[in-house]
Amino acid sequence: MPRKLGELRADLRRAGFRNRGGKGDHQNWEHPRVAKSVGLAGQNGDDAQPYQERAVRVALDELARAQKGVEP
């Protein structure tokens, strides 16, 4: 069962990402220590698409590496 977009957004918020905004239901999440922003589109109760889950996982992994001081 796919996760909900609200769960992905909560994960990003907990990790220190901030919502830069967007048009409609699109949101761009960024963190000063992560090179790329994460774009999520949809309502909080919608099922997350596999590419959205992957983008969040990659961003959180990159943040973890940056906090440990490991280069990508």
Model segments located where?
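Polyanion-binding surface elements
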Residues: 1-19
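Aromatic-residue detector
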Residues: 5, 11-12, 35-41, 51
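Compositionally biased terminal segments of proteins
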Residues: 5, 30-36, 65-72
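Residue-level detection of beta-strand scaffold positions
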Residues: 13, 26-28, 60
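A short, structured beta-strand/loop element
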Residues: 17-46
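C-terminal structural segments of small proteins and small subunits
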Residues: 43-72
